[in-house]
């Protein structure tokens, strides 16, 4: 007795490239240099006391550059990082940064980790994740 199996593959032109195009990473230039400069000023005022001026962390807070940042957040979305940061920072008043200030500080953190700037500002919406931007 012979049993036959049939496997069908349907290819929709452009679908694969459309799906791949939706997933971006922080290596794709997801913030502007001007935004990172604003973020530097905001970081200095709101974050440097605990995370240090060089973003390497201290007794009270982890570093935000190098392996500490990369190993802690690799594979997560930038939205997840923003949501966590918004919920827990600044430590003395979590959630008090404006969405613009939070995006600017994240742009500064990305810049400090040598991720490239791009042509459009980072504009994460804390109400919904939107298109995922992967931390790589």
Task: Give, region by region, the residue ranges found by the protein language model.
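Conserved beta-strand positions that form and line the central face of beta-propeller blades
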Residues: 29-30, 54, 63
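Flexible coil segments in periplasmic/lumen-exposed cytochrome c-class electron-transfer proteins
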Residues: 24-26, 94-136
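Electron-transfer interface patches adjacent to heme c in soluble/periplasmic c-type cytochromes
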Residues: 65-83, 91-103
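Extracytoplasmic/secreted proteins, especially bacterial periplasmic and envelope-associated proteins
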Residues: 34, 38, 42, 59, ...
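Bacterial N-terminal signal peptides
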Residues: 1-14
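Electrostatic cytochrome c docking/interface patches
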Residues: 19-42, 93
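Short cysteine/histidine-rich zinc-coordinating motifs and their immediately flanking basic loops
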Residues: 59-65
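The canonical Cys-X-X-Cys-His
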Residues: 39, 43-54, 105, 109
């Amino acid at each position: 007795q012979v049993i036959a199996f049939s496997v069908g593959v349907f290819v929709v032109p452009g679908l694969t490239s459309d799906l791949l195009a939706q997933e971006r990473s922080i290596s794709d230039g997801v913030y502007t240099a001007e935004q990172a400069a604003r973020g530097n000023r905001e970081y200095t005022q709101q974050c440097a006391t605990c995370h240090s001026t060089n973003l390497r962390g201290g007794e009270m807070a982890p570093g935000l550059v190098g392996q500490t940042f990369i190993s802690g957040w690799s594979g997560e979305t930038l939205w997840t990082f923003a949501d966590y940061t918004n919920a827990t920072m600044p430590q003395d008043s979590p959630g008090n940064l404006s969405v613009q200030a939070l995006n600017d500080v994240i742009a500064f953190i990305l810049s400090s980790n040598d991720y490239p700037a791009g042509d459009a500002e980072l504009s994460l919406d804390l109400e919904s994740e939107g298109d995922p931007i992967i931390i790589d």
